[in-house]
């Protein structure tokens, strides 16, 4: 029997494709909705390697406007135009500036197509923090995370079909993540570095040293950079893999 919620890791890598991994993208499926969390440049490869029709996506949630997290949206648009022939609406949720950034990128990559109206309705919804909304039975809550000062950057908490998922987005460590992930079913946490300590990303020692304080039912490290991949034999926490499917 199918689990109430399935999460497919479409991309578990960082901006540099470390280890040959794809950019950040996660698909959440339930009986009521199918949605994507982040949409990196390699999203179509991730979807098609997992034999997932891009047209199944009801809405997209973007954590912040770095290319490895939103750069795949124009490629989705192109797939919907020429491959899956989408006709139903698509909604994209994201921080302030999402519509302008997405459409500017679409224009830069596919000049002619960006000038014509898309044959399916696309709407952009800017979410604030704290921002809480319900979409197709999914409760979406955005919260601010400390990543880069020039952008509004979010983590997300989702309540879907009786399950709870927290996604850190890109962030430096903050103890707010301990409270945000209390008793959730799945916490997908970025882990970009190992020996390098940064204010804008989490290192493996930082998360490993706090793992005992986390009460989430499952912790999964993602957005993996070259350092944690090179030192994988020293890592005891679960690592995401491209194509991994998690049943909740």
Put a short name on every predicted segment.
Residues 1-166, 232-248:
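Binuclear metal-dependent hydrolase catalytic cores
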Residues 37, 63, 169, 189, ...:
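Active-site flanking residues adjacent to catalytic metal/cofactor-binding acidic residues
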Residues 41-42, 146-149, 171-174, 225-227:
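Short beta->alpha connector loops
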Residues 172-248:
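Cap/insert and terminal regions of metallo-dependent hydrolase folds
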